[in-house]
Amino acid sequence: MMGNKLTLPAELPDEQDLRAVLAYNMRLFRVNKGWSQEELARQCGLDRTYVSAVERKRWNIALSNIEKMAAALGVAAYQLLLPPQERLKLMTNSADTRQMPSESGI
């Protein structure tokens, strides 16, 4: 069954396409938990076909369902809508900030 494969998304989404960003992040967080679409749906109280359609960018999604999915995945709702490219920038900036004091000898 294709929807239950635990494979990471193949390519980064267009940062301007929120449905693509949401689909990418949902799948990324779901696969990292080792969950199938069916398990995510069960944890959220939603139908598996709904989760599948959202991951395939077929449907718009209500904010309340984004909140349910985020809670089930153990992340803040905004993280599902944050382009992965932005997450990488934030992580890089955070790492740079932590390194600055040691590099300057303070």
UniProtKB/Swiss-Prot annotation:
GO terms for biological process: regulation of DNA-templated transcription. GO terms for molecular function: DNA binding; DNA-binding transcription factor activity. Repressor activity is inhibited in the presence of the DNA mimic protein DMP19, which interacts with NHTF and prevents binding of NHTF to its DNA-binding sites. Keywords: Cytoplasm, DNA-binding, Repressor, Transcription, Transcription regulation. Induction: Negatively autoregulated. Is most likely cotranscribed with glnD. It is found in: Cytoplasm. Residues 26-80 form the HTH cro/C1-type domain. Gene3D superfamilies: lambda repressor-like DNA-binding domains (1.10.260.40). Signal peptide: none annotated. Its main location: cytoplasm. The keyword Repressor applies. Transcriptional regulator probably involved in the response to nitrogen levels. Down-regulates its own expression as well as the expression of the downstream gene, glnD, which encodes the [Protein-PII] uridylyltransferase, a key enzyme in the nitrogen regulation system. Acts by binding to a specific palindromic DNA sequence (5'-TGTNANTNACA-3') in its 5'-untranslated region. This is Neisseria hypothetical transcription factor. It comes from Neisseria meningitidis serogroup B (strain ATCC BAA-335 / MC58).
